[in-house]
Amino acid sequence: MPTREIRHPLIRHKIGLMRRADISTKNFRELAQEVGALLTYEATNDLPLESYEIEGWAGAVQVEKIAGKKITVVPILRAGIGMLDGVLSLIPGAKVSAVGVARNEETLEAHTYLEKLAPEIDSRLALIIDPMLATGGSMVATIDLLKKAGCKDIRAMVLVAAPEGIKAVEQAHPDVTIFTASIDQRLNEHGYIIPGLGDAGDKIFGTKQKDA
C-alpha cells in the first residue's frame, strides 16, 4: 500500500516548529503528541460505522459508533511513547501493546528486546507509532512480530520518514500503509534523517543535548 504524507496545514506548521535546534523538551513532547493525534485522525478515517439509537434531550435519536473494531496502539520503545497520549486522546478505549526495539549504532541493525502485546491482538487493528522512520529496521521488526502474533490489519504512523526507511518497509511489508507528517530527504552516514528532527527519543525524554 502507498505511503501517505499528510500535508495538512496544521501538521506542516507543527512539524516545522519541531525542527528548531533550540526547541525545549516540553515543547517537543507536546508537539509530538499533537501531531500523533492528527495522524490518528487520518489513519482511522476508513473505520466502519454502525447506527444505534439513544435517548437524546428531545427523545430518541439515531447516532453512529465505530462498528466493533478493536484497536491496539503499538509504541516502539522508547521514542514511540512520546506520541502515545496524543493517539489515545482520540481512541481512549484502545489497548496498548509495547514493543522494545534497539538499534545497533554501528551496524544500524534492529533487535527486539521486549514485547507485551494486547489480548486478542490477532483480531485488532494495530497502529504502530514511532516518531522516526529512518532505516526501517525497527518498523520491519515490529511488523514481523505483529504478523507472527496473527495481526492482519497493521498501519504505521511516524512523524518523519526517510525514503530509505519507506523503501525497506514497503519491500518487506507491502500491505502496511505508512502515515507520515513528512517525507524527508535522506539518511546521513550515521543513520539519522536529514533534515529530520534530531534524536526524537532524547528530545522527548530530555536525556541529551538538543542538537544530538
Curated annotation (Swiss-Prot):
<feature type="binding site">
    <location>
        <begin position="198"/>
        <end position="200"/>
    </location>
    <ligand>
        <name>uracil</name>
    </ligand>
</feature>
<keyword id="KW-0328">Glycosyltransferase</keyword>
<comment type="pathway">
    <text>Pyrimidine metabolism; UMP biosynthesis via salvage pathway; UMP from uracil: step 1/1.</text>
</comment>
<keyword id="KW-0547">Nucleotide-binding</keyword>
<dbReference type="InterPro" id="IPR000836">
    <property type="entry name" value="PRibTrfase_dom"/>
</dbReference>
<feature type="binding site">
    <location>
        <position position="103"/>
    </location>
    <ligand>
        <name>5-phospho-alpha-D-ribose 1-diphosphate</name>
    </ligand>
</feature>
<dbReference type="InterPro" id="IPR005765">
    <property type="entry name" value="Ura_phspho_trans"/>
</dbReference>
<feature type="binding site">
    <location>
        <position position="193"/>
    </location>
    <ligand>
        <name>uracil</name>
    </ligand>
</feature>
<keyword id="KW-0808">Transferase</keyword>
<dbReference type="GO" id="GO:0000287">
    <property type="term" value="F:magnesium ion binding"/>
</dbReference>
<dbReference type="InterPro" id="IPR034332">
    <property type="entry name" value="Upp_B"/>
</dbReference>
<dbReference type="InterPro" id="IPR029057">
    <property type="entry name" value="PRTase-like"/>
</dbReference>
<dbReference type="GO" id="GO:0006223">
    <property type="term" value="P:uracil salvage"/>
</dbReference>
<dbReference type="GO" id="GO:0005525">
    <property type="term" value="F:GTP binding"/>
</dbReference>
<dbReference type="GO" id="GO:0004845">
    <property type="term" value="F:uracil phosphoribosyltransferase activity"/>
</dbReference>
<keyword id="KW-0342">GTP-binding</keyword>
<keyword id="KW-0021">Allosteric enzyme</keyword>
<dbReference type="GO" id="GO:0044206">
    <property type="term" value="P:UMP salvage"/>
</dbReference>
<keyword id="KW-0460">Magnesium</keyword>
<feature type="binding site">
    <location>
        <position position="78"/>
    </location>
    <ligand>
        <name>5-phospho-alpha-D-ribose 1-diphosphate</name>
    </ligand>
</feature>
<comment type="similarity">
    <text>Belongs to the UPRTase family.</text>
</comment>
<protein>
    <recommendedName>
        <fullName>Uracil phosphoribosyltransferase</fullName>
        <ecNumber>2.4.2.9</ecNumber>
    </recommendedName>
</protein>
<feature type="binding site">
    <location>
        <position position="199"/>
    </location>
    <ligand>
        <name>5-phospho-alpha-D-ribose 1-diphosphate</name>
    </ligand>
</feature>
<comment type="function">
    <text>Catalyzes the conversion of uracil and 5-phospho-alpha-D-ribose 1-diphosphate (PRPP) to UMP and diphosphate.</text>
</comment>
<feature type="binding site">
    <location>
        <begin position="130"/>
        <end position="138"/>
    </location>
    <ligand>
        <name>5-phospho-alpha-D-ribose 1-diphosphate</name>
    </ligand>
</feature>
<dbReference type="InterPro" id="IPR050054">
    <property type="entry name" value="UPRTase/APRTase"/>
</dbReference>
<dbReference type="Pfam" id="PF14681">
    <property type="entry name" value="UPRTase"/>
</dbReference>
